[in-house]
């Protein structure tokens, strides 16, 4: 395993660890999820170019589009939650309320 792949796997693991540790605030969770998606994007693009899979060349772009949609929805939820509750603590949210 070369150093680029090791660094990307390490970045994904650290972002996953960040999601598990910093889950008190919604903003920090969203930032860690974005780091996970970006490391997956780069890793997928490198694997596809390394194995010369031209049929799967659109997969990293599709992942990037879904990542942008996830970031947009997450930020919209963050604005709505901080406007209604006054903070972005995840523990104060009750998802069963209407």
Curated annotation (Swiss-Prot):
Which Gene3D superfamilies did the record assign? 1.10.287.3510
Q: How does it sit in the membrane?
A: Multi-pass membrane protein
Keywords in alphabetical order, please.
Electron transport, Membrane, Mitochondrion, Mitochondrion inner membrane, NAD, Respiratory chain, Translocase, Transmembrane, Transmembrane helix, Transport, Ubiquinone
Top enzyme class: translocase
Q: What is its EC number?
A: 7.1.1.2
Looking at the UniProt entry, the stretches that span the membrane are 1-21, 31-51, 59-79
Q: Domain of life here? A: Eukaryota
Localization recorded for this chain is: Mitochondrion inner membrane
Gene Ontology terms for molecular function: NADH dehydrogenase (ubiquinone) activity
Keyword Chaperone in annotation: no
Q: Which family does it belong to?
A: Belongs to the complex I subunit 4L family.
| Physiological role | Core subunit of the mitochondrial membrane respiratory chain NADH dehydrogenase (Complex I) which catalyzes electron transfer from NADH through the respiratory chain, using ubiquinone as an electron acceptor. Part of the enzyme membrane arm which is embedded in the lipid bilayer and involved in proton translocation.
Q: How does it assemble?
A: Core subunit of respiratory chain NADH dehydrogenase (Complex I) which is composed of 45 different subunits.
Q: What is this protein called?
A: NADH-ubiquinone oxidoreductase chain 4L
- Organism of provenance: Macrotis lagotis
């Amino acid at each position: 395993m070369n150093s680029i792949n090791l660094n990307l796997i390490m970045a994904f693991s650290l972002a996953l660890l960040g999601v598990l540790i910093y889950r008190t605030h919604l903003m920090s969770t969203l930032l860690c999820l974005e780091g996970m998606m970006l490391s997956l994007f780069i890793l997928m693009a490198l694997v596809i170019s390394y194995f010369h899979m031209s049929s799967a060349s659109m997969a990293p772009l599709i992942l990037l589009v879904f990542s942008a949609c996830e970031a947009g929805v997450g930020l919209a939820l963050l604005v709505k939650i901080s406007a209604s509750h006054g903070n972005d603590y995840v523990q104060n949210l009750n998802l069963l309320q209407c």
